[in-house]
């Protein structure tokens, strides 16, 4: 997630395993894109130095030489009125802060969810098990709902849960699951409670809510629904890039993608005397889809919005956008008031507000239902 001025408040991180990054890993070079058409070969340490300075990027090392720029997006007509209020409100009533607190307590207990190490693989495996349990508990597996790993050339895998609809066109909700200790990426403690354990468990709870609707559960919604948990976001949007590039190559149609990156920290707004609000990202997103998201928030959520800019390649919605798919992102706050503990060993659950996370879950349920049903 984008750092910007939050970096100035970051706590000192601690390395607990005592090992250093191997010399050959430091010497390895990666091709990154910092802005459209602006590329650079860097070492891994140079990647983290850019991140520490608040500079985000796509890691495009695995793309073919001569990669293409962002693909033009097709014009998609989004609903201009609310159509499923009764169904959405019934699902919202089932959302549980206790579920999210339980899930996030476990997810942030892993030493780290860094994408290159075994802990990151373990956290992804545990998370996928929770997704499978949600599908099975709802009985959605009997109607074709499933969860699958999306493998990469590093330890952590991405996760895709699919609820079939009458059309193969997909409505996507995504969140990255990896964490990082920027002082010591390979070995440092990185609980990642807010960045992005909060987003991961928020969309998991929203999945549980969506599966309460029998029309959706039984595969009778107009469109297919997918929930994504991306690996390797902190290293340059690796997991989401791979998934949306695959979708582009295979011709998959995506009606819209909503990204949830950090959903739980409100203290920055409170300390500034601001009303607790969503941060609506306005750059590198689809304007029409974002307008639809605003309508959903107005109808189903109890907090207002503040417009904010996130920058190029700041989170996984940018991967959808770059591959020609309309995307939107809603953050926990304006970008300059994000959780100052992100990317450190202090990104703990104690700083988060689960009522705020429930508001994000309401948004997701409304977004998915109004767009897919």
Swiss-Prot record:
Top-rank EC class of the record's enzyme: hydrolase
GO terms under cellular component: extracellular region
Keyword NADP applies: no
Molecular function GO terms recorded: aminopeptidase activity; metal ion binding; metalloexopeptidase activity
EC numbers, comma separated: 3.4.11.-
Gene3D superfamilies in the record: Zn peptidases (3.40.630.10)
CC cofactor note: Binds 2 Zn(2+) ions per subunit.
Activity as a function of temperature: Optimum temperatures are ranging from 40 to 50 degrees Celsius.
UniProt subunit comment: Monomer.
Protein name, as recorded: Leucine aminopeptidase 1
Biological classification of the source: Eukaryota, Fungi, Dikarya, Ascomycota, Pezizomycotina
